[in-house]
Swiss-Prot record:
Enzyme kind, highest EC tier: ligase
Protein's recorded name: Asparagine--tRNA ligase
GO molecular-function terms, A-Z: asparagine-tRNA ligase activity; ATP binding; nucleic acid binding
Keywords: Aminoacyl-tRNA synthetase, ATP-binding, Cytoplasm, Ligase, Nucleotide-binding, Protein biosynthesis
Species name: Legionella pneumophila (strain Lens)
Compartments in which it is found: Cytoplasm
PROSITE patterns with a match to the protein in the record: AA_TRNA_LIGASE_II (PS50862)
E.C. designation(s): 6.1.1.22
Amino acid sequence: MTEVFTIKQCLDGEISIDETVTVRGWVKTRRDSKAGLSFISLHDGSCFSPIQIVATDQLSNYQKEVTKLTAGCSMIATGKLVASQGKGQFFEIQAESIEVVGWVENPDTYPIQAKRHTLEFLREVAHLRPRTNTISAVTRVRHSLAQAIHRFYHEQGFFWVHTPIITASDCEGAGEMFRVSTLDLLNIPKNDKGQIDFSKDFFGRETFLTVSGQLNVEAYCMAMSKVYTFGPTFRAENSNTSRHLAEFWMIEPEIAFANLEDICKLSQNMLRYLCKTVLEERSDDMDFFNQFVAPGCIERMEHIADSEFEIMTYTDAIKALEASEQKFEFPVSWGLDLQSEHERYLAEVLCKKPVIVTNYPQEIKGFYMRLNDDGKTVAAMDVLAPGIGEIIGGSQREERLEILDRRMDECNLNKEHYQWYRDLRRYGTVPHAGFGLGFERLISYVTGVSNVRDVIPFPRTPGHADY
C-alpha cells in the first residue's frame, strides 16, 4: 500500500522526485484543458499552499467523477510526485488514481466558493470557514503560538496548572460573570428574605464561570514556585467590539519570591520568544498575512523580537502625554486609566517600540495588587505594543493580609468568599507576581487580523452562540 503523506511533506522536499505518494484532502479548484487533462488544487490544512493534482482522461473514473469535482469535495489521490512545469509551484502529483470520498451536494449553494470572502460573511459559516486561506492560516499560527507558550514555560521551569472553570470568586471584582446553575427556572427556590436560595443549587452556593485563573494559580505558586495557567475564561460584558469576546483564552504565569521587575523581564522574554517562533515555524502563513491582510506584520514581529522594551512609570507616561501636541479623544489626567489611543501613542509615536508602564493609581487597578510605599499607586504593569496598545497586564500581588483586607473592604468584596485566598497570606506568605495575556489578542496582533472573532474557532459574543 502506498504511504500517505501530507501536502506539507510533499511541498517541503521531504520526498524524492518520482516517488509514488498518496495524499488526501479537499478540492479548492479544478480546471480542465482541451487536451484531456484536469488540474485539481488540493489542500489538507497541513500548510498554506495546496498541491496540484494532474489527472488525465486515462483514469477510469475521469469522465464520471474527476470532471465533476467542485470546491469542497474530498478525495484521495495516488500518483508520482514530480517537478512542476507550472509557475509558482515546485511540485505536483501526476495522478494514477483518484478516489472521491465526499461530494458537495449542491455546488451552487456551497458557501466557500473560489473567491475572496469577507470575514463578516465567514462568521456566519464558522463551521466551514477553516477551509479558507485566512482562517486556516490563523489556525496554524494559533497552534504554533500555543505550543510555543507551553515550550517557553517548560524550558523556564514552570509547571502548568489546570485551574477550575467553575468558581465562586470574582478575580476582577467587576461582577460581569456568567452564573452556573441547575435551579429550575420555573420554580426558583427563595429564602426568608425573598432572595434566590443558592443553597439548593448544585454546588450549594452561587457559582460562576471563571473570569481568570489567577487567584487559583496563586495557591499553587505558593507551593510550586513557578506556575502558569492556560485555558478558557469568560466575561459577561455586553460589548460588541473587535476587541471583546465572551469566551477567550488566557495565559497567566505566577512566580513566588518575585517582584514587579521580575514579571517585566518575563513578559518581555516571552513576547520576544513567541514572535521569533512564529516567524520561524509559520513563514508561509505570515507571508500571506503580510501580503493580503496586514502589510508590515512581519516587520513588526521582527522589531519586537529584536527590541529592548521601554519601561516607564504611569506618572511619567501621563506627563509625556500631557506634554505632547497630540489631540486625544479622551482626557489625559493623573488618576484616569489610559485609553487605547494613549497606549498606542506611547508605543508607536513616543517610544516606537513596546513599552511597559508601571505603578498605576490603586483606584483603577485590582484589589489584589500590591500597594506601593507612596500609598497611592500599586505595583502594576501593562505591556503596550505598537499597533494594538495593551497586550499584557500584571502586577506584584499584595502579600500582606492586613492591606489585602483593607483593599477588599474598599472594593466591597465579601471576604468570606475569599477565605481560602486570604489563607495564602496567613500561612507562609511570600512576595509573588504574575500577569495575564489574552491569547486571542496576541493572535490578532501577530497576524494583523483585527477582529478577535476571527482568530478563535467559534466566537462567543452577545447574541451569538450558534455552534
